[in-house]
Amino acid sequence: MKKTIFIIAIIVCLASCTNQKPLYSWYNYNNVSYNYLKNADEQSTQQMIETYQKIIEKQKGTRQAVPPGIYADYGFLLLQANREEEGKAMLMKEIALYPESKIFIDRILKMMEK
């Protein structure tokens, strides 16, 4: 009896060591965003836009949803690149997916109107 309980306990412990699938797929976001913030040139901006598009289009995490803030960051980047319609659409998607971001997004939109 004790031997059976011990074996079951070991199996449970080993089963808990398996890799968990991440909630979101980030691809190479950390490196690309670091490069963008460090250089802030045209090439790094284009890489950042491509990374955002990949995160949005190819989400493979367990939630199958775009991570919080990605639509907002992408929209703000598009607004800065004078792609206003696309940028505003991304900001609206952020609000639709994460309603608690509405106050922050409204501030961004007011700031961009000035």
Give short role names for the model-derived ranges.
Residues D41-Q53:
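Helix-turn-helix repeat elements of alpha-solenoid scaffolds
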Residues T18-Q20:
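Bacterial signal peptide processing site
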Residues D73-Y74:
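Structural register within alpha-helical repeat arrays
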Residues C13-S16:
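C-terminal motif of bacterial Sec signal peptides marking the signal peptidase cleavage site
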Residues P22-W26, A65:
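Residue signature of alpha-solenoid helical repeat architecture, marking inter-repeat boundaries
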